[in-house]
């Protein structure tokens, strides 16, 4: 499949709400939460006023002019927060485009971008049963903390 990875455009920032919802891990057999769940404060931390902080950066994957995946970072007090100097990462790819290497490409490109901005580390939080754990580990992320449901992972750039 042909796709392009590029920087998000300002007029596309609202799409991050859709990708935030897509990033919520839903185990097989579990009813998805209502889309309004993204309005809770702990999830809005990922997208509220995106682009206004100097460390806000996002890339998107595009297929035939349609944005089908997004990855973004910002320094925030989220589930994956480790310190005030380390951006936290969020990402998702629409279901029908998963398993084709698009997420891996988005991740690789964003890590290069963040390194070019002088960051030495990226963090994230991921549900232990999420298939993306394998992708993060393959990319070089290491588990630095965990609770009963999630891993906190970091990668040195």
Which residue stretches match the model-derived regions?
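Conserved acetyl-CoA-binding loop of GNAT-fold acetyltransferases
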Residues: 137-147
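Conserved N-terminal entry element of GNAT/NAT acetyltransferase domains
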Residues: 1-14, 18
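Short alpha-helical
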Residues: 11, 15, 67, 130-131
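Acetyl-CoA-dependent GNAT
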Residues: 24-26, 30, 35-85, 90-94, ...
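Conserved GNAT acetyl-CoA-binding A-motif
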Residues: 114-127
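Hydrophobic adenine-recognition pocket in adenosine-nucleotide-binding enzymes
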Residues: 8, 91-93, 126
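Conserved acetyl-CoA-binding loop-helix of GNAT-fold acetyltransferases
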Residues: 90, 99-112, 137-138
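Short glycine/proline-centered loop/turn elements that form peptide/ligand docking sites
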Residues: 103, 107, 129-132, 149-154
């Amino acid at each position: 499949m042909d796709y392009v990875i590029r920087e998000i455009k300002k007029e596309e920032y609202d799409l991050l709400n859709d990708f935030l919802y897509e990033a919520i891990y839903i185990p097989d057999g579990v009813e998805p939460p209502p889309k309004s769940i993204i309005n809770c404060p702990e999830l809005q931390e990922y997208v509220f006023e995106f682009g206004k902080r100097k460390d806000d950066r996002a890339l998107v994957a595009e297929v035939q002019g349609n944005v089908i995946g997004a990855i973004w970072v910002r320094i925030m007090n989220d589930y994956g927060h480790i310190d005030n100097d380390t951006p936290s990462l969020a990402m998702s790819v629409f279901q029908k485009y998963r398993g084709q290497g698009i997420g891996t490409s988005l991740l690789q490109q964003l890590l290069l971008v963040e390194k070019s901005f002088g960051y030495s580390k990226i963090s994230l939080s991921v549900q232990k049963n999420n298939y993306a754990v394998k992708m993060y580990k393959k990319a070089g992320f290491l588990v630095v903390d965990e609770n009963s449901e999630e891993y906190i992972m970091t990668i040195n750039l």
